[in-house]
Amino acid sequence: MATTTQPAHAEAPQQGGLLRAALVIFVGLSLVTGVLYPVVVTGIGKAAFPAQAGGSIIERGGKPVGSALIGQNFSEPQYFWGRLSATSPNPYNGAASSGSNLGPSNPALTDAAKARIAALKEADPANTAPIPVDLVTASASGLDPHISPAAAAYQVERVARARHLPVERVKTLVAEHTTAPILGVFGEPVVNVLELNLGLGDLK
């Protein structure tokens, strides 16, 4: 009985066609994800949220003094202090955003907290209240511009004394700069340290 011999292999696909299709897909995706999408999102952001899209820059007298999104290093007694910052070589270095990555048993973490406690007590020896934890710890980004209302309240008397201001006026200023949780549910109440310190300059 006669048998039919099958071809050893199917016809090879056209390599040039596959390469052309891959190239078209690559160029198309590059244009969409690398050009079109960023341009559209940036345009929407600038139109809907111009301040945030521009970095939430805070200005005084027409000059930028900082960003509402990035903390600054305050260590003088007449200012409210923010959280510790683990960025290097300088605190609140936006180009080196990171946490300390130190484990809870690492002596360096304990030493940093002890040093901040000592600095807080030296700046206000009469204050015997418990120190809020956010004043002796760094945030995950190292750039957190906020502290808790409790951390601000801990520093009120020191700041008022250094500026020769009534304590109640400084307390009122803290309350005015306290931001409630989003929709009253998401997050915790916070105080922006830079905005609070700028507000101190407006008190007479």
Swiss-Prot record:
GO cellular component entries: plasma membrane
Cell membrane listed as a keyword: yes
GO molecular function terms listed in the Swiss-Prot or TrEMBL record: ATP binding; P-type potassium transmembrane transporter activity
Compartments, as annotated in UniProt: Cell inner membrane
Keyword Transport in record: yes
Pfam families: KdpC
UniProt KW keywords: ATP-binding, Cell inner membrane, Cell membrane, Ion transport, Membrane, Nucleotide-binding, Potassium, Potassium transport, Transmembrane, Transmembrane helix, Transport
Top-level taxon of the source organism: Bacteria
Membrane topology: Single-pass membrane protein
Predominant location: membrane
InterPro entries xref list: KdpC
Spans through the membrane: 21-41
Subunit structure: The system is composed of three essential subunits: KdpA, KdpB and KdpC.
Protein family per UniProt: Belongs to the KdpC family.
Function summary: Part of the high-affinity ATP-driven potassium transport (or Kdp) system, which catalyzes the hydrolysis of ATP coupled with the electrogenic transport of potassium into the cytoplasm. This subunit acts as a catalytic chaperone that increases the ATP-binding affinity of the ATP-hydrolyzing subunit KdpB by the formation of a transient KdpB/KdpC/ATP ternary complex.
Stated name of the protein: Potassium-transporting ATPase KdpC subunit
